[in-house]
Amino acid sequence: MVVQKSVVRSRVFGELEVSEENIIFFEEGIPAFENLKKFVIVKEDQSPFYWLQSVEDKDIAFVIINPFEIKPDYEFDLPDEIVNKLEITSAEDVAVFCIVVIPEDVKQTRVNLKAPVIINVNKRKGMQYLLDDERYPLRYYLFENLNSNVQK
């Protein structure tokens, strides 16, 4: 089997060589970026952060994090409609990430726990899903919450 590779240009990483099998298709795009459908995940070395890099626009890359690393009790149920749309057949198919906003004052770094990015890693399909759950804020202040969790 021949694996197709292509070069993805990225403002953050320069040129990335990406296997077609690593490209994740977002049928509806990401809210506010609905025209962008193809993304690749790039891991930061020695960091809990990843990048969700658009394959179609070098200037669009989101910092993402596995929410379970910062909030071990994070949990939610996906409705059947989403499970079917992403063709999920087992929990092992699913990777969950949350978008991180890192402002100039890094102490104000926040994570969007309200709208996780759900990825079927086997089918390479993804979407950002808005949870109907008041436990999770749009702006979860990372350092403030990490400090309070350490003090407990």
Curated annotation (Swiss-Prot):
Listed SUPFAM superfamilies: BH3618-like (SSF141457)
GO CC annotations, alphabetized: cytoplasm
Record carries keyword Hydrolase: no
Superkingdom field: Bacteria
Localization, UniProt: Cytoplasm
Keyword Cytoplasm: yes
GO annotation (BP), single: regulation of translation
Keywords tagged on the record: Bacterial flagellum biogenesis, Chaperone, Cytoplasm, Translation regulation
Family, similarity comment: Belongs to the FliW family.
Subunit and interaction comment: Interacts with translational regulator CsrA and flagellin(s).
Biological role: Acts as an anti-CsrA protein, binds CsrA and prevents it from repressing translation of its target genes, one of which is flagellin. Binds to flagellin and participates in the assembly of the flagellum.
PANTHER family per the UniProt record, alphabetical: FLAGELLAR ASSEMBLY FACTOR FLIW
Record-given protein name: Flagellar assembly factor FliW
